[in-house]
Amino acid sequence: MSRDRRRWLVPLAFLAFVSLGLPDGVLGVAWPSLRRTFDRPIDQLGLILLSMMAGYLASSFGGGAVQERLGLGRLLVASCLLVATSAAAWSATPFFLPIVVFAFVSGLGAGAIDASINAFAATRFTPRVITWLHACWGLGAMAGPLVMTALITAGAGWRWGYALLAASLVAMAAFFRLTLDQWELPNGARRPARPRGVAGGLREALRSPRVRANTLLFFLYAGAESTAGQWAFSLLTESRGMTAATAGLAASAYWGSIFAGRLAFGLLAHHVAPAALLRLGLAGAPLAALVVCLTRGGPGGFAGLFALGLLLAPIFPLLIAETPNQVGERHAPHAIGFQISAATLGAGLLPAAAGFLARRAGLESLGPFLLAATLLLLLLHERGARR
């Protein structure tokens, strides 16, 4: 690869991860207004999240084959256009059912590219750059709620937020279309080579207690991260009386703290042992969730959410990085596949369960829910670490 091409590839990859994160934080801020528009109960956010999860899983299974046919650059363009189509449909539909249907389309777009672009990054970039790529996802997830909050508080409404999101993703798709050649791998390098005799069988990996435990860790982590992000705005506005503008800032600060935490981890990666950072995040997250539980006032809830995002931030990339050491090189390829699938399930199922609980026990149940999830995450990790 030429030096000029390499210089452009890293910023392009950063932008690609921003595009992946951009839609993820928007829904939690839009949901109170959206459900009032369609007169839906609070827990039906779960229907949307489950539809997205189904689309993600459906496309992620075939993502590798699609990449082989289209190439990563064209797949990235298609992914942006699918999510843009979903956002545009949301902005225009007069009915709730298309919201659920096009959530599936949005999941298709995200699932098709997520694994492929992570695999591309793994073959091209250092661990520090990969961590910063995931930080860029957090940057996108932070920007979405900020824009949606500004539009809602200005009186433009949630529909304009999704229209702007669609336009942004179309612009990104056009930019990626113009830079297709930057994404092409050299001949024979489309897929990382697998060392012979290293990867164990699928059934053998499933029989490993450590693989099963790690899969549950990812389910709980992604579920806790998504639950906090999707329900924070509703909790702060509908239960704690915070203004939409301030609550939107708090929701954005949560996603922003994930961005900041991963950025900081990239800087600390060569100076602090990964295991120490992982334990810091896992032990601190329940304390942050406890702050969310106990502080009913605005500043305390704001601080609790920010601390929770900051402490959750390094867990996902560190768990991925530690997987070969924890389960062995033999099981690592299958284990990582199980973990990503479990994270997708957790990000859909746990926020849906939190919504079901909120409808029956009130939005204040979110704090104890997060506390329980983060405590289970810590206990499960420590139990595995002692083996």
Where are the regions that the model predicts?
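Helix-breaking motifs and short loop linkers at transmembrane-helix boundaries and internal kinks
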Residues: D39, G71, A92-L97, G241, ...
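A late C-terminal transmembrane helix in Major Facilitator Superfamily
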Residues: E329-L363, L370
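C-terminal transmembrane helical hairpin of 12-TM major facilitator-type secondary transporters
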Residues: V272-L319
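Cytoplasmic helix-loop-helix junction between adjacent transmembrane helices
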Residues: F102-C136
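Helix-to-loop junctions at the C-terminal end of transmembrane segments
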Residues: S59-L72, G261-P274, A358
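Extracytoplasmic gate region of multi-pass secondary transporters
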Residues: L27-G28, S208-S252, G256-A260
